[in-house]
């Protein structure tokens, strides 16, 4: 059950389509929607963040934040679901931490992909924070995609607590009787009922009356790209994966599936931890 949804953005104009999509999802679920609009201080150039910050008195930045909040409230006026719009303003380097300290409680957090953000650095930091510290599942939503109905999903499977969490969170988003393809990259084990196999996951999903498929892909270097390409080729509505099964530092230095999915999101992606 999704009773409360959380959405975060940093620009009303860039995120307009994202907000309309999330409001429609909240209406369909009869869910409450909490929206955080982040207003960073001025930068010499967005791509320089977190460097290149320019000084602006707090009262001026607050006025800018209030102006943007007024635009967002106007855009969502008349919505049939309760919407709680909140604002945070600060230096771009601190906003993700401010968001974490605010600790909004929601059943599902949703964030637009990098195309819907004015500052790429802020998108990455907020997305990582939500995946690691929100205490619930996170969906990254690229432009032109919807969360209204999930009838076909891909579950990226690698034996881990994070992947099991993704399995449980995914079930809560699926339509009754939906199809789930369990997808792993690497050599298929000889026995499917072993710890690396798909049988236990398939049994769980079938018990919940979902249609289940099992796929093993030959692993290539960029697993995040490989998973998304496969999901798009089979027409999946959503890709679900465990988030940061390795440490965030290791992912930042060496790369990883979570970092890849955050960096380039081609279909709705559910991240769970």
Language model region names:
Residues 19-21, 97-146, 232-273:
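Gly/Ser-rich helix-loop-strand patches that form or flank binding pockets
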Residues 54-67:
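A short acidic, glycine-rich active-site loop
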Residues 43, 93-95, 118, 148, ...:
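Generic structural signal for helix capping and beta-alpha/helix-loop junctions
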Residues 36-38, 86-90, 141, 183-185, ...:
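Conserved beta-strand termini and adjacent loop/short-helix elements that scaffold enzyme active sites
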Residues 15, 65, 92, 119-120, ...:
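A conditional alpha-helix N-cap/helix-loop micro-motif detector
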Residues 22, 72, 99, 201, ...:
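Aromatic/hydrophobic pocket-lining residues that form π-stacking "cages" and hydrophobic walls in ligand
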Residues 1-55, 133, 149-216, 236:
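Small/aliphatic-rich secondary-structure junction motif
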Residues 74-109, 207-239, 245-249, 267:
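Structural beta-alpha unit
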């Amino acid at each position: 059950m999704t009773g409360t949804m959380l959405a975060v953005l940093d620009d009303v104009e860039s995120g307009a389509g994202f907000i309309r999509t999330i409001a429609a999802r909240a209406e369909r679920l009869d869910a409450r929607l909490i929206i955080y609009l982040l207003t960073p201080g001025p930068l010499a150039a967005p791509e320089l963040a977190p460097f290149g910050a320019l000084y602006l008195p707090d009262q001026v930045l607050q006025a800018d934040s209030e102006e943007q909040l007024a635009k967002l409230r106007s855009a969502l006026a008349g919505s049939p679901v309760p919407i709680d719009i909140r604002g945070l303003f600060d230096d771009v380097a601190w906003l993700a931490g401010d968001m974490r300290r605010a600790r909004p409680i929601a059943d599902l957090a949703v964030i637009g992909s990098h195309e819907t953000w004015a500052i790429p650095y802020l998108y990455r930091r907020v997305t990582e924070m939500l995946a690691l510290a929100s205490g619930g599942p996170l969906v990254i939503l690229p432009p032109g995609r919807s969360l209204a109905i999930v009838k076909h999903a891909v579950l990226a499977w690698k034996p881990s607590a994070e992947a099991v969490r993704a399995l449980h969170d995914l079930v809560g988003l699926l339509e009754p009787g939906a199809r789930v393809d369990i997808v792993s990259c690497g050599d298929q084990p000889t026995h499917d009922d072993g710890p690396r196999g798909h049988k236990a996951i398939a049994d769980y999903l079938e018990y919940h009356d979902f249609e289940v498929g099992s796929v093993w892909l030959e692993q290539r270097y960029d697993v995040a790209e490989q998973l998304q390409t496969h999901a798009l080729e089979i027409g999946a509505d959503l890709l679900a994966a465990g988030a940061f099964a390795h440490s965030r530092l290791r992912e930042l230095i060496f790369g990883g599936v979570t970092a890849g999915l955050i960096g380039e999101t081609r279909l709705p992606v559910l991240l769970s931890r």
